Each structure stands twice: as structure tokens, then as C-alpha cells.
């Protein structure tokens, strides 16, 4: 029996699909019944307030806002200040004292149990401070071809646990608590999980940390007092002075860009332009290089609308200097009027995220992806570059099965003098424990994230994605290596590979170079074995819309 001359029996079997798709169509009736824990990080309440203020200011007839703006005096930013918050923890009652109200509300809805809080109050404060930092502003990873947002935490904080003999006072008002309605704002509601569920919709975050973070934990026996009350441990948060690099002016940024970009008219070099995406930081098109016939992706960004233009320069320079077969390579860039055009390789297979959420990968296919990613990481690490945001969304696939690492918005260049970074960067569910616990770190944070991504390929999502985001951070900080749902289904060499990636002790964790010699990679299938998975994922995605 044949169909258009092709024997049906000769067709390869369809790739195995996940029984329960982790994508939910826009019209699905079940979207409202999702476990709230399986949703992305909540929207930034500060951002909502900014939008509300903006809309009020442009509403017709609202003259009070304009009048208030005129009357408001100009106040310069504070400088050379030190801000201390004292938070106590009563080991007997298991309660925090002196905790800022906003933190207390978040903790109340975090699903972190009382016993967990009592077990590790320091970790609770670490994740609260990270999650709820007041000084937030949006930043973008400009070269990525999906619209991702980032929260930029500009605090410089250390948390120290010390034993004191008296109940600490209520913390002083933070210098950035300008709005009186802050305390009235309820804790952010965790938004419904989007129809494409995946890491592309979870936020990446960046938070500068102190150059020399201190974490002194002093424990002493607690004796009951006459009133049978126990002096709480004080958890002290010190905001220290931090030297900041002077910001580049718009003119300096333009001057630097002019020295980087090519001269000429890209509209003559590339044609035709087909729009494939629109994001807050720009519009993405595909086009053909007239001279070579190569299909490319072109991102057009209006520079006036970019809040952190210096990040664009950093990203272009890193991509330009680090070309590799396993990296989505930067090809060219142009200044066209007020726009910056960045030309990149185009991979039609989409991101690995679609494959892991819609299909079931076997160990040979997972090994092939891990090998290609490790080759990219070995190259970057040997050039003193840490990617810092490894996850399935940042792995792009070609229809031939090629696997390439992309999105260098948060990459870091390290020097021999600065072999460790101390910045909280990445996407929370993929973060290494040393990042969540605010320690200095090195290139092996990428190896941990690769291990989490391998779990994505097994289970369709990273560990703790179904947990409240705050509790997920707590679990990463305290549990360390996550447990697999069905470890018995994996081969011994795959389990060993995962253990090498997800080793809590950074010194024992494998490097990219070492892991490329691991036995697990020897079972890798040809890259062409990924092509049927991409076709199946695209078909499933189409059916879910």
C-alpha cells in the first residue's frame, strides 16, 4: 500500500511526544486551573506603578499632576550613605522580628514552611532580599530574538547572622521608599502561566553584589529569661558604599558604536525583509545576503528607546570577538538613522525549549545536545567569558540538527585578576547555588545550568518550576542537587554525568573540558536525529494555537 508512491512502511516512526503538553493553547479552558506555583515570576510592582503614573499624566484634563510636577523640588540622589536593617529571628517561636512589611507579605505567600524558615533563616533572608530588592529597573538582552525582560537589582548588600541580647528595632525607612502607598500594595500575584510555558517567559535577573561579601554566622546557646522569652538572632543587612563606573553619555555611546559598526546601506546588502518578531527592544526580520545567499536574522533597535545602551556595546563586542561553530554568530551591524541594525546567523529550527516541552528526547539525543553546548562553553571559558544564562531558550537549532548557544546579554568577561564574579545573574530556576547564596563564582555556574537544562530535556521543565518562585530560590540555596522524578529510568552513565554537572562543591564540579571526555557523550546520536523532533515540536505548537 503506498501514498504518492512512498511505501508507508518505509516511513520512520514519529518521535515520542509528551503525554501532557507543557504548552497550553490560548483558548484552553484549563488555564485558570493551573497550579499557581507553575507560573513565571510575578510582574514587578514598581513597573506597574510607573505605568500607572504615566497613564495618569497623559489623561486629558488631569492638570493636578502637571501642577504637582512644577511644585516638586529637585532632589539629588543620596551619596555616601550607609543603611542598616536589623531583622531578628526568634529560634523558639520560629518568627522573624523587625522584618519589613513587604518582605513579611512575600514570605507569607511563598510556601516556605515554618520548619524550613527555622532550619535556615539566613537562606530565607537571602532569597527575600534578592527577590524583593527595591532598586529595580528593566534591562534587556538586546541581541536575543525573543522578547525577554530582566530585573536589574542595583543593591549592594550583605546579610550577616549574629547573636544579640536584645530585640532589634524596626528597620529604618529605606532611602528609596518614596511612595507612601508602598505598604498598601499587596504582594504580587503570580500570573497565569503563558501558553508557551517555558523558560523564555521566566525572567532573567541581574543583581550587583559586594566585591568582598561577608557571611558570618555566629551561634551561641540561648538561655531563657525571667519572662521566658528568647533573645532573637539578629540578621543585619548593611548597604555599603560601592564604587560605580561612570555612565557613558549618549554621545559617547554613539561614538563607540560608530567605531564598531560597518559603513554602508544594509538595505542593499540584504533583501527581502520578512518580519518574524517584535519585542520591547526592537523588531526582528529575516533576510537574504544578496552576495552569498545566506539567510540571516536582523534586529532593528531604536537607540532612543533603549534604557541601557552600554549593554548593547558589551554584547556586540563579546559576540564579535568570540566566534565558534557552536555559537549563534554575530555577522555585522549598521547605524541607520536612529536605529542600530544587528545581523546574526539565522537558525530556522527555533529554540530547544519547544523540543523539550513537546517531545520526549532519548539519551542519545540529549548527549548530542550536551556535547555541542559543552563545546561552546569550553570555547567561551577558555576565552575568560562566562555566559551566565544557560537554559533551553538560549539554545537555537538548525533544521540540519546544528546546536548553537545564543543570547550574550548577561555574559561576563573575567580577567586573571578577577577570576571570580559576584553578581547575581541568570534565570532563577537555572541558577547555581553559589549564585543564589550570593557568593563569588566562576565559569562553573554555566556547568550547573547545563545540568539543569539536561533535566529539562528529560522531564520537560527545570526542577522547582511548579514551586512558588521564592520557595524555588530557597530550595536551590538549601537543597543543592535537585532530585529527578524517575532516576531509575536513566542509565548509570547519564546519572553520573548529571552528578558531575550538579555537584554542590564547585571544586568537584566538572569543567567543560573535563565533561567533554565523559563517557555519556560517547552515546551521542548524529545531530540529524534532532530534525524529526523539531518538525514534531513545530506541528504541536501549531496545533496548540
From Swiss-Prot:
Q: Where does ATP bind?
A: 276-284, 299
| Major localisation | cytoplasm
Region spans: Autoregulatory region: 70-140
Q: How is it modified after translation?
A: Autophosphorylated in trans, meaning that in a dimer, one kinase molecule phosphorylates the other one. Activated by autophosphorylation at Thr-423 in response to a conformation change, triggered by interaction with GTP-bound CDC42 or RAC1. Activated by phosphorylation at Thr-423 by BRSK2 and by PDPK1. Phosphorylated by JAK2 in response to PRL; this increases PAK1 kinase activity. Phosphorylated at Ser-21 by PKB/AKT; this reduces interaction with NCK1 and association with focal adhesion sites. Upon DNA damage, phosphorylated at Thr-212 and translocates to the nucleoplasm.
Ranges of biased composition (kind: Polar residues): 152-166, 220-231
SUPFAM superfamilies registered for this protein in UniProt? Protein kinase-like (PK-like) (SSF56112)
List the cofactors.
Mg(2+)
Active site per the UniProt annotation: 389 (proton acceptor)
Question: GO CC annotation: what is one?
Answer: centrosome
List of residues that carry Phosphoserine: 21, 57, 115, 144, 149, 174, 199, 204, 220, 223
Q: Could you cite one Gene Ontology molecular function of this protein?
A: gamma-tubulin binding
| SMART domains tied to this protein | PBD, S_TKc
Superkingdom of the source species? Eukaryota
Residue ranges annotated as compositionally biased, kind Acidic residues, are 174-184
Tell me where in or outside the cell this protein is found.
Answer: Cytoplasm; Cell junction, Focal adhesion; Cell projection, Lamellipodium; Cell membrane
Region feature GTPase-binding, mapped onto this chain: 75-105
Where in this chain does the record put each Protein kinase domain? 270-521
In the record, which positions carry Phosphotyrosine?
131, 142, 153, 201, 285
State which Enzyme Commission number(s) the record gives: 2.7.11.1
Matches recorded under CDD domains: CRIB_PAK_like
Protein keywords: Acetylation, Allosteric enzyme, Apoptosis, ATP-binding, Cell junction, Cell membrane, Cell projection, Chromosome, Cytoplasm, Cytoskeleton, Exocytosis, Kinase, Membrane, Nucleotide-binding, Nucleus, Phosphoprotein, Serine/threonine-protein kinase, Transferase
Description of how activity is regulated: Phosphorylation of Thr-84 by OXSR1 inhibits activation. Activated by binding small G proteins. Binding of GTP-bound CDC42 or RAC1 to the autoregulatory region releases monomers from the autoinhibited dimer, and enables activation by phosphorylation of Thr-423.
- What role does it play? Protein kinase involved in intracellular signaling pathways downstream of integrins and receptor-type kinases that plays an important role in cytoskeleton dynamics, in cell adhesion, migration, proliferation, apoptosis, mitosis, and in vesicle-mediated transport processes. Can directly phosphorylate BAD and protects cells against apoptosis. Activated by interaction with CDC42 and RAC1. Functions as a GTPase effector that links the Rho-related GTPases CDC42 and RAC1 to the JNK MAP kinase pathway. Phosphorylates and activates MAP2K1, and thereby mediates activation of downstream MAP kinases.
The similarity annotation says: Belongs to the protein kinase superfamily. STE Ser/Thr protein kinase family. STE20 subfamily.
In Swiss-Prot or TrEMBL terms, this protein is called Serine/threonine-protein kinase PAK 1
Taxonomic lineage from the root: Eukaryota, Metazoa, Chordata, Craniata, Vertebrata
Amino acid at each position: 500500500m503506498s501514498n504518492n508512491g512512498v511505501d508507508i512502511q518505509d516511513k520512520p516512526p514519529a518521535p515520542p511526544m509528551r503525554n501532557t503538553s507543557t504548552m497550553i493553547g490560548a483558548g484552553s479552558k484549563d488555564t485558570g486551573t493551573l497550579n499557581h506555583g507553575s507560573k513565571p515570576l510575578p510582574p514587578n510592582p514598581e513597573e506597574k506603578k510607573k505605568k500607572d503614573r504615566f497613564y495618569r499624566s497623559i489623561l486629558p484634563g488631569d492638570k493636578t499632576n502637571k501642577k504637582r510636577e512644577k511644585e516638586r523640588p529637585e532632589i539629588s540622589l543620596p551619596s555616601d550613605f550607609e543603611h542598616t536593617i536589623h531583622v531578628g529571628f526568634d529560634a523558639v517561636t520560629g518568627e522573624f522580628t523587625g522584618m519589613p512589611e513587604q518582605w513579611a507579605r512575600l514570605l507569607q505567600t511563598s510556601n516556605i514552611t515554618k520548619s524550613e524558615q527555622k532550619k535556615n533563616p539566613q537562606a530565607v533572608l537571602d532569597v527575600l532580599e534578592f527577590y524583593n530588592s527595591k532598586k529595580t529597573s528593566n534591562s534587556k538582552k538586546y541581541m536575543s530574538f525573543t522578547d525577554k525582560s530582566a530585573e536589574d537589582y542595583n543593591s549592594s548588600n550583605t546579610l550577616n547572622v549574629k547573636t544579640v541580647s536584645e530585640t532589634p528595632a524596626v528597620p529604618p525607612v529605606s532611602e528609596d521608599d518614596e511612595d507612601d502607598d508602598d505598604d498598601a500594595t499587596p504582594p504580587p500575584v503570580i500570573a497565569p502561566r503563558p501558553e508557551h510555558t517555558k523558560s523564555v517567559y521566566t525572567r532573567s535577573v541581574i543583581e550587583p553584589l559586594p566585591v568582598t561579601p561577608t557571611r558570618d554566622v555566629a551561634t551561641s546557646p540561648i538561655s531563657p529569661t525571667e519572662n521566658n522569652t528568647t533573645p532573637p538572632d539578629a540578621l543585619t543587612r548593611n548597604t555599603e558604599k560601592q564604587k560605580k563606573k561612570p555612565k557613558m553619555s549618549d554621545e559617547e555611546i554613539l561614538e563607540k558604536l560608530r567605531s564598531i559598526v560597518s559603513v554602508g546601506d544594509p538595505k542593499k546588502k540584504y533583501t527581502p525583509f520578512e518580519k518574524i518578531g517584535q519585542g520591547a527592544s526592537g523588531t526582528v526580520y529575516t533576510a537574504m545576503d544578496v552576495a552569498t545567499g545566506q539567510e540571516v536574522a536582523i534586529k532593528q533597535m531604536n537607540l532612543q528607546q533603549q534604557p541601557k545602551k552600554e549593554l548593547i556595546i558589551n554584547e556586540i563586542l563579546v559576540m564579535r570577538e568570540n566566534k565558534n561553530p557552536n555559537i549563534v554568530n554575530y555577522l555585522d551591524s549598521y547605524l541607520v538613522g536612529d536605529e542600530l541594525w544587528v545581523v546574526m546567523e539565522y537558525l530556522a529550527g527555533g529554540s530547544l525549549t519547544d523540543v523539550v516541552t513537546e517531545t520526549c528526547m532519548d539519551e542519545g539525543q540529549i548527549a548530542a545536545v550536551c556535547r555541542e553546548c559543552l563545546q561552546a562553553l569550553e570555547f567561551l571559558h577558555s576565552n575568560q567569558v562566562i555566559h551566565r544564562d544557560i537554559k533551553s531558550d538560549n539554545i537555537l537549532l538548525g533544521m540540519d540538527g546544528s546546536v548553537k548557544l545564543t543570547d550574550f546579554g548577561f555574559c561576563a568577561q573575567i580577567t586573571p585578576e578577577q577570576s571570580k564574579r559576584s553578581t547575581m545573574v541568570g534565570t532563577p530556576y537555572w541558577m547555581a547555588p553559589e549564585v543564589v547564596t550570593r557568593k563569588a563564582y566562576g565559569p562553573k555556574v554555566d556547568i550547573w545550568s547545563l545540568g539543569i537544562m539536561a533535566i529539562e530535556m528529560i522531564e520537560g521543565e527545570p526542577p522547582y518550576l511548579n514551586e512558588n518562585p521564592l520557595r524555588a530560590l530557597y530550595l536551590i540555596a538549601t537543597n543543592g542537587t535537585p532530585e529527578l522524578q524517575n532516576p531509575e529510568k536513566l542509565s548509570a552513565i547519564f546519572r553520573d554525568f548529571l552528578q558531575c554537572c550538579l555537584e554542590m562543591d564547585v571544586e568537584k564540579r566538572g569543567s567543560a573540558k573535563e565533561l567533554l571526555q565523559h563517557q555519556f557523550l560517547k552515546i551521542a546520536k548524529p545531530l540529524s536525529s534532532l530534525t524529526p523532533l523539531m518538525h514534531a515540536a513545530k506541528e504541536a505548537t501549531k496545533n496548540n494555537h
